[in-house]
Amino acid sequence: MNIFKILFILNYALIFLIKIYQNTLSKIFGLQCIYKPTCSKYSIECLKKYNFLTALILMTLRIIRCNALFKGGNDFTPKYKPILESLKEFKKRLIK
């Protein structure tokens, strides 16, 4: 099996796990995310739009930003240069 098939399978396996989270734990703990779309929806969008490694970096940066040290609001998946845009968003939203 080549690496592209493995990464494709990983993308959809992670989407499956996120959907399980959305339908179970997310409902138990309530909506805690400070962003629109929520971090789990953002993660699914990243996994559908980008390769596994890029999506993983974007998801990690977003989850790190989802706390009281950062300004919330609308934060959609970046269209161009996704990792660079996400890092800029990280710096821009940090509460000083």
Curated annotation (Swiss-Prot):
InterPro entries assigned to the protein according to its UniProt record, in alphabetical order: Membr_insert_effic_factor_YidD
SMART domains assigned to the protein according to its UniProt record, in alphabetical order: Haemolytic
Disulfide feature: none
Protein's membrane topology: Peripheral membrane protein
Location (main, coarse): membrane
This protein's UniProt keywords: Cell inner membrane, Cell membrane, Membrane
A Gene Ontology term for the protein's cellular component: plasma membrane
Subcellular location: Cell inner membrane
Keyword Membrane set for record: yes
Pfam families: YidD
NCBIfam families in alphabetical order: membrane protein insertion efficiency factor YidD
Main function: Could be involved in insertion of integral membrane proteins into the membrane.
Family according to the record: Belongs to the UPF0161 family.
Name under which the protein is recorded: Putative membrane protein insertion efficiency factor
Originating species: Borreliella burgdorferi (strain ATCC 35210 / DSM 4680 / CIP 102532 / B31) (Borrelia burgdorferi)
